[in-house]
């Protein structure tokens, strides 16, 4: 085991400047070297006898000794050596002290090198006397400092202190900081930002945009600024220089002169000129700007008028070159026979979605209609559909087996039957057959109804897929596809059947995915397949279907997506318990404020029969509608309500979407819906076709998940108010309600 050896101590520093001899003068020759000292390297020792000359010469160590010593050193180094904490600190401080001294020595050497060769020559001259010829001596220092040294014999002045090192901390602090950095690591959050450098950097590149008035020299030499020309006007004045009064005076003088020259033909020409002048005044100028869009002719409508028109009906469109909406049925572009049917059915004014969607559909463009419930979407796709298939050859024995020309997909049986009733009003007078394919009926019976062929088939996705898989129906010549309530179909799990139906369509008449799909002339010449999708919301699955099967569609948005129509007044009441809600329902029905038909919604279908019995005990007739009813029972219940044979319909969310019952004055949510979308479609059963309605909702603490959305919907409505108990409820303050509280506890 060998002890740790310390390195030899550093050489002593050079003697101070005050004890050094002055340099030799340059005018005195150097003394000759001693005779006994040779100038070259001494190779032969002197003949003089030295002490210990007769002793035995020390022999060098052998190889075995060297190897043995090396093995001993390696063995000792391999053995662990215990060092106490004090020894380790002492070794580290000693090592650090040497590093600091070495760094200080290097800095002093670099500082001394800045003075040139004067210091070097001075130290060399003071340390030893030259012993060789002049050529072997160090060079004499030159420059101004050397001349001062020769004159007064002093050293060169010390170098000027560096500005950067002028405020250097003392060595003890620097040493402590370096030791701290070595053992604890560098500081991670230490900022290297320099405010002085940043300020300097920004002020150098800052451009001054201000200018003074005395810098403007245009007044000195440009006469335009000193002699401004005044425009001369006639009469009251106008930008063109003439007013209407002056123009009328000139026209009147011209007409009088014309009549005097030729009383017969001049008077006729004067009448034509006056008529032209009158029309010019009516059609142009300020008078047209002041007119409302309803008072203008179609050719006089400007871009500003169309913008105001869209704002009035809350219409938003996007998707390329989209035609302007129609203001009335006469400007729709529909054939005369279809317009006569519209008038016969009783559609006086088109709804907002009909104004925007029909002109686009007549150009054979694919369409996505995002409209609130109860906005009249059925007629917006039925009328363009009839115009399209009227251009196709009629069905006969040769093409009857190739399937229908158009299919309409609906999520529920009730909605499909309702669409079939509305479609038959327009299709039957034009000679087109319609067929409905829904569940609840015998599939063989429905196939027998289609034995003569049908141009239009309205179906639910599940039953239509069954017919296609059983080879009872083919879609070989289907050229028109409509998906009504597409988001509802996706929610009910019909995404896969919808994809199967759309994949079964022929690809020969599919539109190209290019700019030609937006050209109405090209689409009409080719008679390509046209696809229309109507929805109230746009979930991801609906967007996925639209991207796959629609080509450059035009998107029409009516109102705000997910909001109720403005014709429905929403009232909400905080009532806990079934019995209290039944008493409040009896008060509402007995108030006489609302006339039948009335719809009451509940969340659980077993409550339908119980609530219906209670309503009968109150003195009102009622029927029920829920998922456990057969198709015949559903149709009978809706027929009784439409024919006003019963007063109240008690239903679940099955009837909350797509069921069109006219003149529903009141909707009561006996149980608050589980989602705000279901609530929107429930209250959409009233206030349809531009009529007003009322929706009353009972809510409790169990509905905390939807209270925030309910409060937001009431806030956006202009005819509804938010009650204080709902406004201050804890669950209505943030989205999520009770779910966020549960997540916070877990």
Swiss-Prot record:
GO biological process: mRNA splicing, via spliceosome
Keywords carried by this UniProt record: ATP-binding, Cytoplasm, Helicase, Hydrolase, mRNA processing, mRNA splicing, Nucleotide-binding, Nucleus
Residue ranges annotated for the Helicase C-terminal domain, each copy included: 567-730
EC id: 3.6.4.13
Catalytically driven reaction(s): ATP + H2O = ADP + phosphate + H(+)
Residues covered by region (Disordered): 1-203, 721-746
Entry GO terms, CC: catalytic step 2 spliceosome; cytoplasm
Cited CDD domains: DEADc_DDX23 (cd17945), SF2_C_DEAD (cd18787)
Gene Ontology terms, MF aspect: ATP binding; ATP hydrolysis activity; mRNA binding; RNA helicase activity
Domain Helicase ATP-binding: 358-556
Residues binding ATP: 371-378
Highest taxon in the source lineage: Eukaryota
InterPro entries (UniProt xref): DEAD/DEAH_box_helicase_dom, Helicase_ATP-bd, Helicase_C-like, P-loop_NTPase, RNA-helicase_DEAD-box_CS, RNA_helicase_DEAD_Q_motif
Motif (Q motif): 327-355
Biased composition, class Basic and acidic residues, residue ranges: 65-74, 84-109, 722-746
EC class (word): hydrolase
Stored PANTHER family: ATP-DEPENDENT RNA HELICASE DBP3
Function field: ATP-dependent RNA helicase involved in mRNA splicing. May destabilize the U1/5'-splice site duplex to permit an effective competition for the 5'-splice site by the U6 snRNA, resulting in the switch between U1 and U6 at the 5'-splice site. May also act to unwind the U4/U6 base-pairing interaction in the U4/U6/U5 snRNP, facilitating the first covalent step of splicing.
Subunit structure: Component of the U5 snRNP complex.
Family, per entry: Belongs to the DEAD box helicase family. DDX23/PRP28 subfamily.
Domain remarks in the Swiss-Prot or TrEMBL record: The Q motif is unique to and characteristic of the DEAD box family of RNA helicases and controls ATP binding and hydrolysis.
Protein name as it appears in the record: Pre-mRNA-splicing ATP-dependent RNA helicase PRP28
